[in-house]
């Protein structure tokens, strides 16, 4: 619950998923907090159901990738522009613009929630400004889609200059375009998991098997929420990063006649531990 102060009393308001998203966005963008750290400790986030958590993940991650583009769009419909220091005004407009332009959420749901948030955090007068700007975005959506600046505008200025100098403007445009796409996640399944369990796990993730024990998926929730996480039945590791261990295992089998479980391997600089898990999964110490 949050408190909305009025002239005579304090009214308690239930936090919707978009309100939780706004508060998380303020912490991420203005206070440089890590998204993963926030949601682990957030009572409001953990109170959401699975569907709302997935939506919040998608929304915040899209905001992190495209907030500069969103700001340029809504500032087009603001007479004087919205200053960065106006945290909640910017936050409400970024989150709403992302929903309208990139996530294609129904305008009524977005505008109604945005106006309510504005009334809570920045007052009645500013809520009218929010409503006016977002209505213009809805009315002129096709113009907004044509107006969207290149993806590279989302890159920090120092990084854009460095990459342009090193790779050239054309290549930087392509790098930035790819950087805006949600990255797939590779999940490596332990030998403990039966084939039937692996196939069911793949279906639950809406993923595809790219190697005998690797499922690639587009996860929209916390990995800790997936079954088998606490039991060590799987771990996160890019498919390409498995190659060194696979080569090592091949050489061990080729050159050592003794049982593989008598071989000891020193894994130097092993954080975050994907290769270590891979070695342990193959019964190496």
List each model region and its residues.
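Glycine-rich nucleotide cofactor-binding entry segment
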Residues: 139-282
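Short beta-strand element of Class I
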Residues: 285
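Non-catalytic accessory regions of SAM-dependent methyltransferases
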Residues: 1-138, 148-149
């Amino acid at each position: 619950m949050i408190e909305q102060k009025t002239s005579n009393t304090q009214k308690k308001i239930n936090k919707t998923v978009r309100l939780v998203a706004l508060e998380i966005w303020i912490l991420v963008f203005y206070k440089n907090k890590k998204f993963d750290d926030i949601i682990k400790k957030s009572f409001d986030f953990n109170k959401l159901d699975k569907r709302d958590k997935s939506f919040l993940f998608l929304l915040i991650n899209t905001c992190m990738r495209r907030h500069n583009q969103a700001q340029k769009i809504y500032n087009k419909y603001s007479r004087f522009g919205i200053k960065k220091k106006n945290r909640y005004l910017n936050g409400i407009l970024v989150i709403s613009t992302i929903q309208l332009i990139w996530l294609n959420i129904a305008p009524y749901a977005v505008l109604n929630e945005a106006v309510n948030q504005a009334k809570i955090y920045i007052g009645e007068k500013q809520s009218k400004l929010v409503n006016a700007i977002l209505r213009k975005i809805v009315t002129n959506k096709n113009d907004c889609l044509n107006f969207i600046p290149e993806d590279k505008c989302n890159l920090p200025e120092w990084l854009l200059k460095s990459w342009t100098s090193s790779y050239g403007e054309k290549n930087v445009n392509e790098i930035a375009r790819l950087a805006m796409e949600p990255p797939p996640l590779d999940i490596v399944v332990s030998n403990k998991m039966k084939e039937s369990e692996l196939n069911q796990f793949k279906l639950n993730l809406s993923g595809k098997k790219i190697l005998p024990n690797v499922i690639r998926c587009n996860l929209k929730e916390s990995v800790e929420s997936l079954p088998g996480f606490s039991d060590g039945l799987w771990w996160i590791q890019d498919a390409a990063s498995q190659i060194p261990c696979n080569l090592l295992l091949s050489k061990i089998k080729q050159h050592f006649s003794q049982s593989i479980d008598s071989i000891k391997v020193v894994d130097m600089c092993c954080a975050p531990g994907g290769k270590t898990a891979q070695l342990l999964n193959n019964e190496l110490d």
